[in-house]
Amino acid sequence: MPWGPSMGLRLWRFAAGVCAGAAVGVKWNSLFFIAAMGLLTVFWDINARRIVGLHKWGLTALVRDGIPAFFQMIGVGLLVYLSTWAGWFQSSNAYFRRWAVENPGKGVMWLPEDLRSLWEYHVSAFKFHSGLSSPHTYSSQAWQWLVLGRPTSYYYESPKLGSSGCTVKSCSEAILNIGNPAIWWAFIPAIIVALLVLLLKRDWRFGALLVVFGAGYFPWFMYPTRTMFYFYALSFEPFLILLLAGVLGLAL
């Protein structure tokens, strides 16, 4: 079998598609993670066919692995994502719900009216959020996140003597969203070590974690003037934790 086997339906990819659709239903920037992880799995399939010496391993992997992977992850994910809009579809007066009816001949005409309205809703939301730029005391740019340059304030009060347990002239009460400095500052050398291990030892585990971290972090640099906050970094923090654990594991 010079072209190698066809893996058919891979349930773990199907499950990944379900999770992907649910993730995008919560936060759109999940798309970057899904793209990175999906491409990684196809790359691993390509490399596996190359290692066993199959004929035209790159082309066959794209056809026999890449196309099924697309439908199992992206196709399934799209259906799950649309299901998160069930309430919007069932409504008759939701925001943008009647856009296609009120704007005949406009938008993506090959889509059914319901989906055309939903698409325009997405376009409008994307334009608003990607261009959102307004001064905010606790805003922080992406380059500040790893060094905890500007935590996000969730609560602040200045009670005076005799109120809220304050026993001096003036007190401060604050709740800040800030990571553990010992862990977050350790992420930076961990990233550098992981890059060196990847380059020198070709350790795919660090490569995978770096790719997924990059997918969650670097897209934010495309919007240098957008109002952003430190808590945006929480989406890729789990992968940095795994990266740090992997680097510490090198010493064991």
Describe each PLM feature range.
Residues 2, 9, 33-74, 95-97:
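Perimembrane helix-loop-helix junctions
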Residues 32, 227-249:
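Hydrophobic/aromatic-rich transmembrane helices and adjacent perimembrane loops
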Residues 1, 39-50, 193-202, 248-252:
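Structural signal for the C-terminal ends of transmembrane alpha-helices
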Residues 3-27, 38, 217:
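Membrane-interface alpha helices of multi-pass inner-membrane proteins
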Residues 24, 213-228:
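Transmembrane-helix signature of polytopic, lipid-linked glycan biosynthesis machinery
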Residues 8-15, 19, 32, 60, ...:
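Alpha-helical transmembrane segments of integral membrane proteins
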Residues 62, 68-69, 73, 77-150:
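Aromatic-rich transmembrane-lumenal/periplasmic boundary elements in polytopic membrane proteins
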Residues 137-140, 149-206:
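Membrane-interface anchor segments at the N-terminal boundary of transmembrane helices
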